[in-house]
C-alpha cells in the first residue's frame, strides 16, 4: 500500500452517456429521445509541504521525544474533492412533446489540516426532477386598437423542482470529537411559460420559489419568491 500523499498517477475522471435504447423499435414508437448519463469528477491537491530537517535517511524509523516517527516531509493541508455530477440522469422526450428529466447528484469535499489534526468534511445530495411540454401553433384572439387579430405561436411550458441537502462536519482527530459547523437544506421550485407573439417578439412568465433551512441554530430559515413577465424582442432576422 502506497502511503505517499504525493500521487504519481492522477485520479480518473469519466463521463458516460447512453442513447442506444432510442434505436429499439419499442422505444422509437414512444420516445423522440431517451438517454441515460453518468459523470465523475475528482481533484486532489497538496497546498503546502516541505522537507523535514530532522529526518535521518540512515535511520528512517527514528522517533521524536513524544514517540512519533519523524517523517521525511512535513505536510500542512491535503484536499480531496469528488463530484458525481450526475450520479445518474434520465432525459426523455415523448412523441407528444412531453419532456421529463430526473437527476441525482452527489458531492464530497475533504480538507485535512495536519497542523492541528482537523478534518473538515462537506457532503451534499441533490435530487432534480423537471417536466416540459410544448403546445404547437396555439391560437389566441386579441382585440388591439379595435382590430381583431389572431396570434399563432408555440407555447412552451417548463417546471423544475430540486431538493438539496449539504452538511459540513469538523472532526478533531486527536480527541475523537465531531461537530456540525455548517449546512443547509434547499428546496427550489421553478416554472416558466413562453409564447411567441410574433417572429421577433416573445413573452415569458416566470415563477421562482426558493426555501432554505440551515443546520446550525444561529441561522433562521429563508424563503424567496420571484415572479413576473418578460418581453423579449429579437432584432435579428
For the regions a protein language model found, what residue spans apply to each?
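Exposed, low-structure sequence patches enriched in small/polar residues
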Residues: 1-237
Amino acid at each position: 500500500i502506497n502511503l505517499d500523499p504525493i500521487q504519481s498517477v492522477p485520479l480518473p475522471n469519466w463521463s458516460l452517456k447512453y442513447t442506444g435504447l432510442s434505436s429499439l423499435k419499442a422505444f422509437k414508437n414512444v420516445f423522440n429521445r431517451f438517454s441515460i448519463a453518468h459523470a465523475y469528477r475528482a481533484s486532489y491537491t497538496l497546498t503546502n509541504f516541505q522537507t523535514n530537517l530532522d529526518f535521518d535517511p540512515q535511520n528512517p524509523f527514528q522517533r521524536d521525544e513524544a514517540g512519533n516517527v519523524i517523517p521525511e516531509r512535513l505536510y500542512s493541508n491535503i484536499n480531496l474533492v469528488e463530484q458525481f455530477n450526475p450520479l445518474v440522469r434520465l432525459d426523455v422526450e415523448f412523441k407528444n412533446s412531453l419532456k421529463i428529466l430526473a437527476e441525482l447528484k452527489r458531492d464530497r469535499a475533504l480538507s485535512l489540516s495536519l497542523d492541528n489534526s482537523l478534518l473538515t468534511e462537506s457532503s451534499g445530495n441533490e435530487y432534480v426532477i423537471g417536466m416540459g411540454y410544448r403546445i404547437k401553433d396555439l391560437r389566441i384572439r386579441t382585440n388591439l386598437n379595435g382590430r381583431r387579430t389572431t396570434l399563432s405561436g408555440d407555447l412552451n411550458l417548463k417546471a423544475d423542482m430540486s431538493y438539496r441537502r449539504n452538511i459540513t462536519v469538523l472532526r478533531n482527530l486527536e480527541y475523537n470529537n465531531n461537530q456540525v459547523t455548517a449546512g443547509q437544506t434547499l428546496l427550489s421550485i421553478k416554472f416558466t411559460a413562453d409564447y411567441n407573439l410574433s417572429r421577433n417578439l416573445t413573452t415569458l412568465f416566470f415563477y421562482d420559489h426558493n426555501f432554505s433551512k440551515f443546520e446550525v441554530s444561529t441561522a433562521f430559515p429563508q424563503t424567496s419568491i420571484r415572479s413576473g413577465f418578460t418581453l423579449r424582442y429579437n432584432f435579428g432576422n
